[in-house]
């Protein structure tokens, strides 16, 4: 009789090997990840430090930065530690943690981007009613809903995925535990779960995406009816950053989770997963800081404050 689950750990084959080219690539990825963590941390700091950014729009942006930081922290530290130490094992509990947080953060970000699109719709199409249409109470409810819906999906995936038997097939050809990759190793019929997961992914991607498209369709119609060129420019400026982030996130997510099995390959999965877990979190703060004058203004004021504090400390030190 075949023994099941005799090995408690899984083996992550990783993203890199120890060739010279991959060592350079690893250092580049590590630099990108550290820059991503710094950029998102700075975005959160600026939003909470500058009272001019204490609006629902920037609160939602701070939640996006928090999700991106957590997404990077869920996968990269383990990948880097495995590469540096040569140990590729990950426990079932560790695998479960990654399986839980990835859908939690990815799914939460789907809904959060829809909430941000509604915020822009209210600001552009109904500026006089914006405080009512996007009250702080509604903003907090929407934020909590994004986290809870993502967490419900993550918990379901983690529990069901780890409940399958793995009869000695413990090598995961990936750099983190991801449900679609892991269920391929199960020595049980996973077709029902895979179909249910596919439907769930389609709903979690397409429902928010449809809301985003509807919001921007209404925004575009409102902008085209604006007589003032300056008002049009301001409306496009306030929405362009969000549109760019939506395009990056949904492009990678749809390519990853909505492709037929016949078009899947391990190498493609790794590349796309690296894009949305490492590169997208880097690009988000860059997009918002480059395109948003209010964020750039907050950064200048914060740097000015830091310089003044340093100058005062030096003056106090000299006077002693």
UniProtKB/Swiss-Prot annotation:
Q: Does the keyword Methyltransferase apply?
A: no
Domain of life from the UniProt record: Eukaryota
Residue numbers on the Cytoplasmic membrane side: 48-55, 119-137, 218-234, 291-320
An example Gene Ontology cellular component term from the record?
A: plasma membrane
Per the UniProt topology annotation, the Extracellular ranges are: 1-23, 78-98, 157-193, 258-270
Query: One biological process GO term for this chain?
Result: detection of chemical stimulus involved in sensory perception of smell
Keyword Cell membrane included in the entry's annotation:
yes
Glycan-linked positions: 17
Write down the InterPro entries for this protein, in alphabetical order.
Answer: GPCR_Rhodpsn, GPCR_Rhodpsn_7TM, Olfact_rcpt
MF terms in GO: G protein-coupled receptor activity; olfactory receptor activity
Give compartment(s).
Answer: Cell membrane
List UniProt keywords, sorted A-Z.
Answer: Cell membrane, Disulfide bond, G-protein coupled receptor, Glycoprotein, Membrane, Olfaction, Receptor, Sensory transduction, Transducer, Transmembrane, Transmembrane helix
Task: Provide the membrane topology annotation.
Answer: Multi-pass membrane protein
Which segments cross the bilayer?
24-47, 56-77, 99-118, 138-156, 194-217, 235-257, 271-290
Which Gene3D superfamilies does this UniProt record tie to the protein?
Answer: Rhodopsin 7-helix transmembrane proteins (1.20.1070.10)
- S-S bridge residues: 95-187
Q: Summarize the protein's role.
A: Odorant receptor.
What's this protein's family per the entry? Belongs to the G-protein coupled receptor 1 family.
What this protein is called in its record is Olfactory receptor 2T33
């Amino acid at each position: 009789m075949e023994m099941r689950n005799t090995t408690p750990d899984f083996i992550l084959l990783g993203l890199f090997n120890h060739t010279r080219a991959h060592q350079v690539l690893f250092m580049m990825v590590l630099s990108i990840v550290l820059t991503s963590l710094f950029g998102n941390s700075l975005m959160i700091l600026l939003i909470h430090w500058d009272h001019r950014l204490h609006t629902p729009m920037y609160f939602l942006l701070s939640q996006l930065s928090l999700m991106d930081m957590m997404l990077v922290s869920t996968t990269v530290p383990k990948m880097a530690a495995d590469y540096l130490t040569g140990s590729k094992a990950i426990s079932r509990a560790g695998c479960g943690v990654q399986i839980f947080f990835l859908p939690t953060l990815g799914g939460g970000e789907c809904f959060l981007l829809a909430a941000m699109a509604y915020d822009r719709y209210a600001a552009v199409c109904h500026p006089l009613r914006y405080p009512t249409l996007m009250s702080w109470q509604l903003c907090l409810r929407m934020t909590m809903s994004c986290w809870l819906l993502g967490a419900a999906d993550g918990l379901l995936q983690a529990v069901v995925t780890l409940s399958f038997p793995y009869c000695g097939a413990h090598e995961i050809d990936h750099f983190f535990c991801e449900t679609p990759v892991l269920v391929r190793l199960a020595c049980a019929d996973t077709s029902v779960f895979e179909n249910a997961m596919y439907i769930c992914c389609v709903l979690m991607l397409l429902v928010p995406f449809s809301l985003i498209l509807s919001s921007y369709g209404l925004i575009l119609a409102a902008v085209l009816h604006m007589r003032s060129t300056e008002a049009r420019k301001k409306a496009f400026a306030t929405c362009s950053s969000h549109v760019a982030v939506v395009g990056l996130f949904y492009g990678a997510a749809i390519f990853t989770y909505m492709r037929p099995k016949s078009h899947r390959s391990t190498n493609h999965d790794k590349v796309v997963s690296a894009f949305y877990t490492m590169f997208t979190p880097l690009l988000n703060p860059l997009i918002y800081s480059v395109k948003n004058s209010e964020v750039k203004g907050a950064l200048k004021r914060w740097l000015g404050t830091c310089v003044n504090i340093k100058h005062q400390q030096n003056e106090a030190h000299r006077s002693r």
